[in-house]
Amino acid sequence: MLLYLIYGPTCSGKTDIAIQIAQKTGWPVVALDRVQCCPQIATGSGRPLPSELQSTRRIYLDSRRLTKGIIDAEGAHRRLILEVDWQESEEGLILEGGSVSLLNCMAKSPYWKSGFQWHVKRLRLGDSDAFLARAKQRVTEMFAIREDRPSLLEELAELWNYPATRPILEDIDGYRCAIRFARKHDLAINQLPDIDAERQQDLIEAIAKEYLEHAIMQERDFPQWPEDGARQPVGPATLMRIQ
């Protein structure tokens, strides 16, 4: 089986590339994203809309309520291995995402040395100003109701009604920033979806900056795998981390 690995920081266009490859090959895409395993935060976690998938198949490693917490990296890695084994009849599989902890689990596991062929594509952070422009556009889209999916702020307002979800939301990019913004401006969380345009723009910029901080962390902590445009065997677990 050929495993096509696409990884990189948030807002780098990984999902779009994965969808394009899936359209050309017909292969499924497995999301290497622990937060996207919670459908209740589909918007804030960056799950693509059904229309954006363009009839391609996207597989999540779990589907759980937020009250159960975010799946841990080791659990996600076990599910990933099961999914790859389940898809063994496929000619290829696309692995796409940016979970640092999950990718590092892969880098340490001997499973990925067991005869797969690899095509590795890493997307880079690049220029900070260009990143912030992309991130602002992404957050602006998250603040809109699209295809009947609630906005990020509506997801937050709804889930804030359940005390068990609050510490989890405070640990997720985007939601954490919105919660701090509400406290700073003496707003109730359920008021956030109705803030005026000026405050909304301030919050969009704040979340974009938080995404940049997260992207810098990802760039620092990702495993370093060679990128190869040919169908060459590549064993990620055999590679040394570049400091």
Curated annotation (Swiss-Prot):
- Identify the EC number(s): 2.5.1.27
Q: Which reaction does it catalyse?
A: dimethylallyl diphosphate + AMP = N(6)-(dimethylallyl)adenosine 5'-phosphate + diphosphate
| Keywords associated with the record | Cytokinin biosynthesis, Plasmid, Transferase
Which branch of life, at top level?
Answer: Bacteria
- Transferase recorded as keyword: yes
Q: Name one Pfam family in it.
A: IPT
Annotated Gene Ontology MF terms?
A: AMP dimethylallyltransferase activity
Q: Is the Transferase keyword given for this protein? A: yes
Example GO BP: cytokinin biosynthetic process
Record InterPro entries = P-loop_NTPase, Tzs
Q: Which family does it belong to?
A: Belongs to the isopentenyl transferase family.
Q: What does this protein do?
A: Transfers dimethylallyl groups to AMP as part of the biosynthesis of cytokinin phytohormones.
The name on file for this protein is Adenylate dimethylallyltransferase
Q: Give the gene symbol.
A: tzs
